[in-house]
Regions:
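Short, low-complexity N-terminal intrinsically disordered segments enriched in polar/charged residues
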Residues: 18-67
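A short gly/proline-enriched turn/hairpin at secondary-structure junctions
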Residues: 70-80, 92-95
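Surface-exposed, charged secondary-structure patches
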Residues: 90-128
Length: 161
């Protein structure tokens, strides 16, 4: 009788462990699926940003930023908030025309915040002299999910060459 009780207890403990492992596996799978969905949404945002840059379209850039977004261009002052960000991009687009592609190195999501590291490569047409030059930058995006949408909260880049 004593042995039967021990076997029954062991069997119950084993079943409980298997159930816990199954729950952990299900939670892990669900988290992976959520991460994949979030990363896909961020990729879409980054490629929309690339398209807006290539079109030199301030009106397509601005909605991609949060209301308090910060643009930190290389060799220029930081722009904070929609008005300054708009003025910065208007100036940039008056000076150059980009033709670039983005290559995503890394996206890390943590709740409603994420960061992305990218490299952009292509060409830049300088309006002042009509010259086209090679363009290659590395970028860091800090992203924030607001109202269910990923947006650029902070963005900075520097030239690689």
């Amino acid at each position: 009788m004593k042995n039967l009780f021990i076997y029954a207890t062991l069997l119950l403990a084993l079943a409980a462990c298997q159930n816990e492992t199954k729950n952990q596996s299900n939670n892990s799978t669900q988290n992976n699926m959520e991460q994949t969905t979030e990363k896909s949404a961020i990729e879409k945002l980054l490629f929309s940003y690339r398209d807006a840059l290539n079109a030199s379209d301030v009106n397509k850039v601005l909605p991609l930023y949060t209301s308090e977004g910060v643009f930190m261009p290389s060799n220029a002052p930081s722009a904070v908030g929609q008005e300054q960000v708009k003025a910065s991009y208007e100036f940039v687009f008056s000076q150059i025309q980009l033709n670039i592609e983005f290559y995503i190195d890394e996206i890390v999501v943590n709740g409603d915040y994420a960061f992305a590291r990218t490299i952009s490569k292509g060409t830049t047409l300088i309006h002042a002299n009509g010259q086209t030059v090679a363009e290659e930058n590395r970028e860091l995006f800090v992203l924030q999910k607001t109202n269910g949408q990923w947006k650029i909260s902070r963005y900075m880049f520097n030239k690689m060459k």
